[in-house]
Curated annotation (Swiss-Prot):
PANTHER family listed in its UniProt record: REGULATORY PROTEIN RECX FAMILY PROTEIN (PTHR33602:SF1)
InterPro entries linked: RecX_HTH_1st, RecX_HTH_3rd, Regulatory_RecX, WH-like_DNA-bd_sf
Location relative to the cell: Cytoplasm
Positions of transmembrane segments: none
Record protein name field: Regulatory protein RecX
Family named by the database record: Belongs to the RecX family.
Biological process annotations from GO: regulation of DNA repair
Gene name for this UniProt entry: recX
Gene3D superfamilies: Winged helix-like DNA-binding domain superfamily/Winged helix DNA-binding domain
Annotated Pfam families: RecX_HTH1, RecX_HTH3
GO CC entries: cytoplasm
Primary role: Modulates RecA activity.
Length: 159
């Protein structure tokens, strides 16, 4: 007969979560709170994890960007990161990094999804809606679609 399992300590739970993927401080606090006796216990553990560099909001933000930047625009990624209470410094750095690569990322997403200029206004609207829903700005989407139209007008094959 199997022995009953001992409940995991708060530290073991935290390390288990962090061993699977990066977490923000707020996300880890939310996951650990039901298992702690007090809020102070959770905060002390989170402070210790940050001191040991096992928990880092900056690393978490980089992880989210690395996982999702190839599919989503700056607006959508920033909205997701804001829900994790990262702080203005980390968000500012990430936003600057994302805006610098927004055009290239949007072009790659557009080419993967559509690959050719819109044939009519309905298709153009569909492409714009798709790209804006992915978090790309209307200005960037317009430039990409206009660039594709220009290629078609020149008689070249779209890239």
């Amino acid at each position: 007969m199997a022995l009953p399992r001992q409940p995991l300590s708060l530290k073991a739970r935290a390390l288990g979560y962090l061993s699977r993927r990066e977490h923000s401080r707020a996300e880890l606090r939310r996951k650990l709170a039901p298992h702690a006796e007090s809020v102070d216990e959770v905060e002390a553990l989170l402070d210790w994890l940050e001191g040991e560099n096992w928990l880092s909001n900056t690393r978490f933000a980089e992880s989210v960007v690395h996982r999702r930047a190839s599919r989503y625009g700056t607006a959508r990624l920033m909205q997701e990161l804001k829900t994790h209470e990262l702080g203005d410094d980390a968000l500012g750095e990430v936003k600057a990094q994302l805006q610098a690569s927004e055009m290239a990322r949007a072009k790659a997403v557009w080419e993967r999804r559509f690959g050719r200029p819109p044939a009519d206004m309905a298709e153009r609207a569909k492409q714009v809606r798709f790209m804006v829903a992915r978090g790309f700005s209307r200005a960037v989407v317009s430039r990409i679609i206009q660039g594709a139209d220009a290629l078609l007008d020149d008689g070249d094959e779209p890239v």
